[in-house]
Amino acid sequence: MRRNILTALACSWLTAHAASVDLKSLLLESDIQWASDTVISFSDTPEFEDATVRWNSYNAPTYAGAISPADEEDVVKVVKLAKEHNVPFLATGGRHGCTDMVGLQEGLAIDLSQINSYEVDSDDATVTVGAGSTFGQFQNAIHDAGFMIQSGSVTCPGFIGITLGGGIGRYTGIFGLEIDALISARIVTADGEVLTISETENAELFWGVRGAGFNFGIVTSATYKLHKLADNNNGEILTADFIIPANKTLFYFDWLESLGETMPPNAAGVSRFQFDSIAKEGQIGANWVFIGPEDEGREFLSPILDLQPSVAMLSYVPWNKLIETAGGGQGAMLCEARAPRSLFTGQMRKYTALTLQETFDKITTLWETHPGLAYTSLNFEAFPNHAAVAVPDDATAYPWRDAIGWFQFEIISLEGVGSDSFNAGEHAGQVLRDSWVRTSGYDNHTIYVNYARGDETLEQKYGASKLPRLAALKKKYDPDNVFGWNNALPTEYPGSG
């Protein structure tokens, strides 16, 4: 607790100090030779909006100015400038984060979206992407070159940003986490130094970046290994969308529990607990994928089909078209920015039907008693971990390779933040999060850091066994905590030396 308080006090001091700095004059100083395409913007301009708009507007940071660097050299310049003048800043790619960042007020936004290059090397079976590249920008190029890569569930987040926290997704069972595909990266540290990191170069920092990377610098580019389509069913995927009504959810959850550790590595599911505005009741919108022959996929999904869901739509698509197809194309909806979302999240290493049903029932009661929460929903991701756990636990900083399920309870109130319905949703979120722990398979609440709300302990996000090494890295590469707004690490921890 004392470590968290000290970090908060340091961040508060930086925010207060920023108010006394004339950021506009600082950024527009004539002696600074920014690249011609670098954009500097301030409030009430379209450029500023483009550089700062966030997927989640709840408890969001605020900025006095923004810079959109055109290249790595300008990233170095702005980091040095901000550190020299004690200006708090946050570097972002797709700005699709879950974590509350209300502590950062009137800071500097470093928008990396212009550094969005990508290059596929077919001979080496790699792709190199820039800091602001999103999966949606380069997935087709990878496919057309004859490859595929593990990714998250939507196309709009910055690909590198997802990687820095671990990178779970539908392909975790066959390819592992995104960090398991990472070969090397270039990172700008707090001193403005550019380092190449890999298993053979700055290897200890490379270890820490794979699971807590946003604590050590700004990654300007990264190279990943690709997987041949020819080795993976030519990249063809069976995708199946189902609508499961309230009276059949327990049967569906029983099937999920029966999978347990037997779920095949080439299958994955996302189940959305949502309100049916026509039937005026809860339902589950589920998408399941099977990376393999269509007949095998249909056999795997036969227990769901036997439930006779109210909707069942199956199609066979190339992997690069999955996100735009799955869930009736809900990927685009999940990328809509600006909504005030309060999120409560959790993870598990086993599926329990009773917990899933109790969660569904509690949210149903919430919909019934608070009509303003009709757009409130819960996503439950079921991703097998075969390839993830095949990597030794101590190979990377990521601590939760044994997890196979993730909850994301998303509170959106039509009546606005602070309304009775919003507050009821927040209370329900606390209750639900506590209830998930009991059957999660973990002794305490744990969370994939990219899904962290921000109120979790260090141990719940990073794992107690990883923290000594992580704290030592933080002390070495960012002792002043300039990269301290996104689930910050301490510079001291028992055993860190």
UniProtKB/Swiss-Prot annotation:
Family, according to the entry, reads as follows:
Belongs to the oxygen-dependent FAD-linked oxidoreductase family.
Q: Which cofactor does it need?
A: FAD
Indicate yes or no for the key word Nucleotidyltransferase.
no
Q: Which Enzyme Commission numbers does its entry carry?
A: 1.-.-.-
Underlying gene: fogF
Q: What class of enzyme is it?
A: oxidoreductase
Q: Which domain of life is it from?
A: Eukaryota
Recorded protein name is FAD-linked oxidoreductase fogF
